[in-house]
Amino acid sequence: MLDKVKHIILVLSGKGGVGKSTVSTQLALTLAEADHKVGLLDIDLCGPSVPYLLGLEDRDVHQCDEGWVPVYTSAEKRLAVMSIGFLLKNRSDAVIWRGPKKTAMIKQFLEDVNWDELDYLIIDTPPGTSDEHITVMECLKTVRTEGAIIVTTPQEMALEDVRKEVTFCKKTGIPILGIVENMSGFVCPNCSECTNIFSSGGGHSLAELAKVPHLGTLPIDPRVGELAGTGKACVKELPDCTTSEVLRELVRTLTTVGQ
């Protein structure tokens, strides 16, 4: 039920472990902090981490006549969340499904969740390019999709996978809103100095090569990592850190694109 959603944004990554779900959740929280009504759909069936990141693992989804009712992060209902993680008894439970069953579940997530009026729906996708991604693209053909944000890290292997992701988006007709480079340097929790651990500037160079916007560079910040599992917005808890600055600028960019 996407007819009540104004803007749909996909968050993609070429490989796992680049912080895609963290970017998705903090982006959703930042939009909600800016008084937007937001939905966050986690379709990473084999590795659903959104319920954990938002501190919602003990919550259940319910069904009504109109479909599944998403989980809300607060009484204000500014952020609604749906994930297969809510349907599993334990976080360690494995989803061992073949392609057709995964496809059916993703279609159900996209068509049968009873979202309220939403300004933004953020879709956190699995890493790579697979059946799940093709299903999402097919289901979104009939609705307006703002585009995709691609998350990468500075390592050459991650950048190589992002090149494939860029090609996938172009072939499937999904606009690329830009590239976010995550884990670029380590911020010392004592002096706040940022030290490069991997190579630097890869995300920016790749954005130039692919002729898409570079949306920001996020460092490894232990203070931000401590927010995992709390459901707290980085922009509210750590307003002066680099990650918050990048997230606020990202939201400004997205809201400008959506106008």
Curated annotation (Swiss-Prot):
Binds 4 [4Fe-4S] clusters per heterotetramer. Contains two stable clusters in the N-termini of Nubp1 and two labile, bridging clusters between subunits of the Nubp1-Nubp2 heterotetramer. [4Fe-4S] cluster binds at C188, C191. PROSITE patterns: MRP (PS01215). GO terms for molecular function: 4 iron, 4 sulfur cluster binding; ATP binding; ATP-dependent FeS chaperone activity; iron-sulfur cluster binding; metal ion binding. Its cofactor is [4Fe-4S] cluster. One of its GO terms (biological process) is iron-sulfur cluster assembly. Transmembrane segments: none annotated. It is found in: Cytoplasm. It holds the Pfam family ParA. Keywords: 4Fe-4S, ATP-binding, Cytoplasm, Iron, Iron-sulfur, Metal-binding, Nucleotide-binding. ATP binds at G14, K15, G16, G17, V18, G19, K20, S21. It comes from the Eukaryota. The keyword rRNA-binding does not apply. Its main location: cytoplasm. GO terms for cellular component: cytosol. The keyword ATP-binding applies. Component of the cytosolic iron-sulfur (Fe/S) protein assembly (CIA) machinery. Required for maturation of extramitochondrial Fe-S proteins. The Nubp1-Nubp2 heterotetramer forms a Fe-S scaffold complex, mediating the de novo assembly of an Fe-S cluster and its transfer to target apoproteins. Belongs to the Mrp/NBP35 ATP-binding proteins family. NUBP2/CFD1 subfamily. Heterotetramer of 2 Nubp1 and 2 Nubp2 chains. HAMAP family: Mrp_NBP35, NUBP2. This is Cytosolic Fe-S cluster assembly factor Nubp2 homolog.
